[in-house]
Amino acid sequence: MFDRSLASFLLPAQILMAKLLAISSFWKAAGMTRFSTLFQKPKPVIAMVHLGALPGSPLYDAAAGLEGLLSAARADLMALQAAGIDAVMFGNENDRPYEFQVDPASTATAAYVIGQLRAEITVPFGVNMLWDPRASVALGAATGAAFIREIFTGTYASDMGFWAPDAGDAMRYRDRLGRSDMLMLFNISAEFAHSLDQRSLPDRARSAVFSSIPDAVLVSGQITGEAAALSDLEAVKAILPDTPVLANTGVKHETVADVLRVADGCIVGSSLKRDGD
């Protein structure tokens, strides 16, 4: 016999689950659509423009000053665009030691450099201020970036200490700044760090997509320039067939074909530079 009391409990739960699954499917499809709409081609290659060490960093070259930073960034940008790269991303990889809260002077200087180059950028561009989601959002909003990259989810033990970024805060901050159109690329395997989450990388990726609605998921190696394991890319892509999955580190000319056989794109930095610098 039909148990009305049980049904009154189960049916709302089933409806709620159906709604949650529908929302998840919507955001997966939206993420792939936003990603493909931005890049306009399959499997984009995004090249890094590594800014020189910025003011506030111990490695900043005060003698060369802002003009030195601008000149170096312009040279990299022009070379990459002339070579036919699909997109570029400006980042502060040289601001070592890294911080979880970037010096405002560094973010302001990055905005100045990108602003000076803005009219010369002919491809989609993104930004990343390591390892500060809010600074990355602010820089992206100020410069008109099409996308940002950061660690937005998870809990880590790292060279910089314990680390627990807040995706909800970063995404709401982006929207408050009027840039809900700016894509958020989630690095789910942080360099220089070890996840304290006992779940597998694919499970963490799937959870991040459901809970934090990224536009793409990035898989990294242990440090800058070290390749993500192809098996990790395969496992994450298998569990996220409807979400863009990119290789974030260590892609080289001799491996890019194998990487793009699995991944939906890649980010390339060191391997495009003379002596990796």
Model-derived segments and spans:
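N-terminal small/glycine-rich loop or linker at the start of catalytic domains
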Residues: T37-A64, L177-F192
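Hydrophobic faces of well-ordered beta-strands that scaffold small-molecule active sites
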Residues: V45-V49, F90, F125-V127, R149-E150, ...
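Glycine-rich anion/phosphate-binding loops
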Residues: A63-A75, M129-D132
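Glycine-rich, proline-tolerant flexible connector loops at the mouths of alpha/beta enzymes
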Residues: A87-A108, T155-S158, V217-A227, G276
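Alpha-helix-loop-beta-strand connector modules within alpha/beta enzyme cores
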Residues: F100-G126, A167-M184, A228-A247
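Catalytic cores of alpha/beta
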Residues: D132-T143, V251-G265
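Conserved anion-binding
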Residues: A141-P214
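Glycine-rich phosphate-binding active-site loops on the catalytic face of alpha/beta enzymes
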Residues: A146-M160, L218-I223, A263-D277
